[in-house]
């Protein structure tokens, strides 16, 4: 099996640039994007022309374990960036955030275990540290997320 990397959240700002950088570095990339009826790949729609067509796109939803398993087949590494952002919406729609950010991550981990994926990198946000107690903030800073999406 050739090294294939699954990038979840590839339709987001960071995920799209990561996908582009991985392709430029010679990696075989499967870009997991959120399905939508417009067939839009989010920020990937705007990637450089010389990159388009050099990565595989999988349209799905990390909340669906069946689709996650299908997306992960033949991959040996996962860069998990898929999540919902926008703090104000998390206050009035917390279940949606839990389903995507928590259960979606669980689906990624379970599929990785099933397919013996050897490497998983999960991204987060500096917002998990809350108001800075000291600067610069390091990874040793106490975790004190201020909202549901930052815990």
Language-model segments: residues:
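N-terminal Rossmann-like NAD(P)+-binding domain of SDR-like oxidoreductases, especially those catalyzing
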Residues: 1-149
């Amino acid at each position: 099996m050739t090294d294939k990397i699954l990038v979840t959240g590839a339709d987001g700002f960071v995920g799209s640039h990561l996908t582009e950088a991985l392709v430029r570095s010679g990696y075989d990339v499967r870009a997991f994007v959120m399905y939508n009826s417009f067939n839009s790949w989010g920020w990937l729609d705007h990637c450089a022309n010389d990159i388009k067509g050099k990565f595989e796109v999988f349209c799905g939803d990390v909340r669906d374990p069946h689709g996650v398993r299908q997306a992960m087949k033949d991959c040996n590494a996962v860069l998990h960036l898929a999540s919902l952002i926008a703090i104000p919406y998390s206050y009035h729609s917390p279940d949606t955030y839990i389903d995507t950010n928590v259960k979606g991550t669980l689906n990624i981990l379970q599929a990785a275990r099933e397919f013996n994926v050897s490497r998983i990198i999960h991204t987060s946000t500096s917002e998990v540290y809350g108001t800075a107690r000291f600067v610069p903030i390091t990874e040793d800073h106490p975790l004190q997320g201020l909202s549901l999406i930052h815990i």
